[in-house]
Amino acid sequence: NYRSCENSCLSVTVNSNVYHEEDKMSTVAVQRSKTYDIVYIAVFAVIMAICSWISIPMTVPFTLQTFGVFMAVGVLGGKRGSLAVLVYILLGVIGVPVFAGFSGGLGILLNNTGGYIIGFLFSALVMWAMESLWGKKPVIQILSMVVGLIVCYAMGTIWFMVVYTRTTGAVGIGTVLGWCVIPFIIPDLVKIALAFVLSRRVRKLVPMQ
């Protein structure tokens, strides 16, 4: 009986130590995952800033911002990608010059083209929603990018019309589409194609939990 009790106690001790080590390993894994998340989100916020600095002045500046948004969600997934876009926008709001033309500040969001910047976040959220509903299949990823782009166009165009009407005068939707959307459709579709191909390759190199 003594030997049996001794063996039982030893077994309990060993099991307890094993569980303790597993808990420690689990905690370390969670902490490491959170660290990775923070780093990846920060990196893609910087990438979006760099994409915005590559700019051609137009009524709505031509930039690679949408490419940056699509890459962020494509590589990091909907949740992390959306957070990266949010961080990027918040950096701009507090004055960090991450927007087109090395600009920053809340005033950028409040001017004619600010709706397109806000639209980036809603594009990412739409992509996240579609990913959550239908997974990460290639056709879903491409479709989510296209739908996200349409959402960005819609928000930006409505915002532009409202602000322009208040500050300058009435303007028709056809005119605004001609200024702010139509010239960008083909370039944006090219960005979607590039982001789709590159994000699927980069995602294989990025360790994700």
Regions found by a protein language model. Give the residues of each.
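Hydrophobic transmembrane alpha-helices
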Residues: 25-82, 94
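Short helix-perturbing small/polar motifs within transmembrane alpha-helices
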Residues: 25-28, 43, 50, 106-154
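Membrane-interface elements of multi-pass transporters and channels
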Residues: 32, 54-58, 79, 94-98, ...
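Alpha-helical membrane-inserting segments
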Residues: 47, 51, 55, 72, ...
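Interfacial aromatic-anchored transmembrane helix boundaries in multi-pass membrane proteins
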Residues: 52-64, 89-123
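Alpha-helical transmembrane segments and their helix-entry boundary regions
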Residues: 81-85, 108, 141, 176
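Membrane-embedded alpha-helical hairpins and interfacial helices in multi-pass inner-membrane proteins
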Residues: 136-209
